[in-house]
Structures are given as structure tokens and as C-alpha cells.
């Protein structure tokens, strides 16, 4: 993958499995990706293709019967697959890495612009001013 840009998040050969009724279900098979600083990465796929499961691996939100069976996830030099405690994940989840879930009742407000909602999250988690990030949020909205 890319070596000449600032890689924020790197996932290599991720395999996610779930224990279901005395069987092992493989939900993610060998996914690799890189998130580059200043760029937007979109996960696109059919319902049930594993988008939400993959993003849950980046935030430590897999269900109790799930696990990362193979691969590595590096966030700015930190091995996320080595994190085990809820306290460790609290330092990452929401503050550094966040997910907008598909459930329309818990994700985006249909009466607000996407840009204003992205700005709200940036202000809450990064403590930046609204004016500074309004431009960045608009850029993100245009790229969706």
C-alpha cells in the first residue's frame, strides 16, 4: 500500500469471526485498507456485506461472540488489535475514530445538513472552532 503519504489507519488482512450456534461464521475475509490524512475513505457495499462489522473492529465494538481472528490494525502507530480493556478503547472511540451507523434513528438528523452534523462532531471531539471546520465539513459533504 501507500508509503509516501501520512497513513492514519492501516488494516492488513483482517479476518473477523463470530461464534454462532457451535459454529464459526467468518464475516470479514482478508480486508486491507489505508486511511490517508486529508483524504476521505468510503465503505460501500450491499446490506449485510460487512461494512458495519469492519468499522466495529476499528472501534472495539464487536459483539461478545465476535473477534479479530487474523490481521493487524494500526492507528497512528498504535496496534488496535492489542487493546483489550474498555478504558483503553474509550481513549480511541469517539475521540479519535468514530462511526456513523446505518440506523436512521441513531445516525444523521434528516432536518440538518450533513455538513452541520459533521461540524458538530468535530467541535465536540476535537474542541476546534466552528468557523475553522465549516469549510472542512463542506468538503467532506461534497465528497459523499
Regions found by a protein language model. Name each.
Residues 1-135:
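ABC transporter nucleotide-binding domains
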Amino acid at each position: 500500500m501507500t508509503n509516501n503519504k501520512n497513513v492514519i489507519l492501516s488494516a492488513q488482512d483482517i479476518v473477523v469471526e463470530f461464534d454462532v450456534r457451535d459454529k464459526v461464521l467468518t464475516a470479514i475475509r482478508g480486508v486491507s485498507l489505508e486511511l490517508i490524512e486529508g483524504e476521505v475513505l468510503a465503505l460501500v457495499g450491499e446490506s449485510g456485506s460487512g461494512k458495519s462489522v469492519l468499522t466495529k473492529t476499528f472501534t472495539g465494538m464487536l459483539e461478545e461472540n465476535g473477534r479479530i481472528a487474523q490481521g493487524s490494525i494500526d492507528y497512528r502507530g498504535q496496534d488496535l488489535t492489542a487493546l483489550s480493556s474498555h478504558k483503553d478503547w474509550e481513549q480511541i472511540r469517539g475521540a479519535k475514530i468514530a462511526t456513523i451507523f446505518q440506523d436512521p434513528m441513531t445516525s444523521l438528523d434528516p432536518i440538518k445538513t450533513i455538513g452541520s452534523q459533521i461540524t458538530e462532531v468535530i467541535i465536540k471531539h476535537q474542541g476546534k472552532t466552528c468557523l475553522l471546520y465549516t469549510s472542512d465539513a463542506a468538503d467532506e459533504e461534497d465528497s459523499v
